[in-house]
Design a protein with these regions (language model features):
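Glycine-rich FAD cofactor-binding loop and adjacent beta-loop-alpha segment at the N-terminus
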Residues: 1-18
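Conserved FAD-binding catalytic core of PHBH/FMO-like flavoproteins
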Residues: 102-175
């Protein structure tokens, strides 16, 4: 959980914290490049996703939300939700679809899925004490740990979360092989216990965000950060945006649609589009990128950390800035 997302929560999460890290280690594989941006506040906070989700549900219930468990949506017709395991029907004025990257409910609502989904795999592993001690000092990202992607090593209470993601899906993807190779690069040769899960991350937004009285938000909308594939921050932001839209629209559907699209196109879409372009440069043009990071990597790491903190956004004049830096890079050679 990066700081920009954590500070959007108006409640304490200490009860589920598994670690806080003020420093991030960023490596570029096979290059003599290592950056360690550091801040006074926790850049990244570690939580287990099931504990985090449970806390979110508990807080929502405290504000009057009703939780329906084991209630798989079977169909949506004219604003009426029907369920697979009961005869219950619910008529809703607004249906907010926030069911994650695969988003089966958006399919039932008739949304076309034009998002780019990138594959990732993560292992929760218990390692010998000396390995855990060595790797538990900071959060670590390794660029090029997988082709056209990166790896991560996140220390938790008593284990490590190690994974890889690939941001260019045209290449043949062997996630398990990439992750096993990455673990060897980390010096992990003995694993006491492990559990693995694969998943996809949507890094481009849908063209259509509203259909009838259905609104998609978060990963269901394709709002994950295209550069680092982090989705919780924009999920929280888009949740706040739709809540504001419903309130400011005075429960009127057309006004709510207008408000939601207006706010999303102002606060989210422009930065996502810039992020997509920057990710393409960063992960696909590795030769030029490596020259760039040799000279300006420290500055780029500091700027990315400011984005993690919610203090900055990706630059709207990124083309101009990249061109200037690239000219300086080649004139320096």
């Amino acid at each position: 959980l990066v700081y920009r997302g954590r500070k959007m929560l108006d409640f304490n999460i200490d009860e589920i914290l598994e670690g806080e890290f003020n420093q991030v280690d960023i490596f570029v594989k096979d290059k003599d490049v290592h950056f360690t941006p550091k801040r006074e506040m926790p850049v990244i906070s570690m939580v287990m996703r099931d504990s985090f989700d449970h806390l979110l549900v508990k807080k929502a219930q405290e504000f009057g939300a009703e939780l329906l468990q084991n209630s798989e949506v079977k169909s949506i017709e004219n604003g009426i939700l029907k369920f697979a395991n009961s005869d219950e029907e619910i008529e809703a004025k607004f249906i907010i679809i926030a069911d994650g990257a695969l988003s089966p409910v958006s399919k039932l609502a008739g949304f076309k899925d034009d998002r780019l989904l990138i594959p990732a795999i993560e292992y929760e592993i218990e390692v010998p004490e000396e390995d855990f001690e060595r790797l538990s000092k900071s959060v670590r990202f390794d660029i090029d740990a997988a082709p056209f992607g990166y790896g991560w090593c996140f220390p938790k209470n008593n284990h490590l979360s190690v994974g890889v993601g690939v941001l260019k899906t045209k290449a043949k993807v062997k996630l398990k092989d990439y992750c096993e190779s990455y673990m060897k690069d980390l010096g992990i040769t003995t694993i006491i216990s492990e559990s693995a899960h694969g998943f996809v991350i949507p890094v481009t937004p849908r063209a259509e965000l509203v259909k009838g009285n259905c609104f998609v938000i978060g990963d269901a909308a394709g709002f994950a950060d295209p550069i680092v594939a982090e989705g919780i921050s924009n999920a929280l932001l888009s949740g706040k945006i739709i809540a504001e839209a419903v309130s400011e629209g005075n429960l009127d559907l057309e006004k709510t649609k207008e408000k939601y699209l207006e706010k999303v196109n102002e606060k989210l879409i422009p930065e996502l589009k810039i992020g997509i372009k920057l990710a393409k440069f960063f992960y696909e043009n590795t030769t030029i990128r490596n020259l760039f990071v040799k000279k300006f990597g420290s500055l780029a790491a500091e700027r990315l950390t400011e984005v993690f903190l919610g203090k900055s956004t990706y630059p709207s004049d990124y083309k101009k800035k990249l061109q200037e830096k690239l000219k300086m890079t080649f004139s320096w050679m």
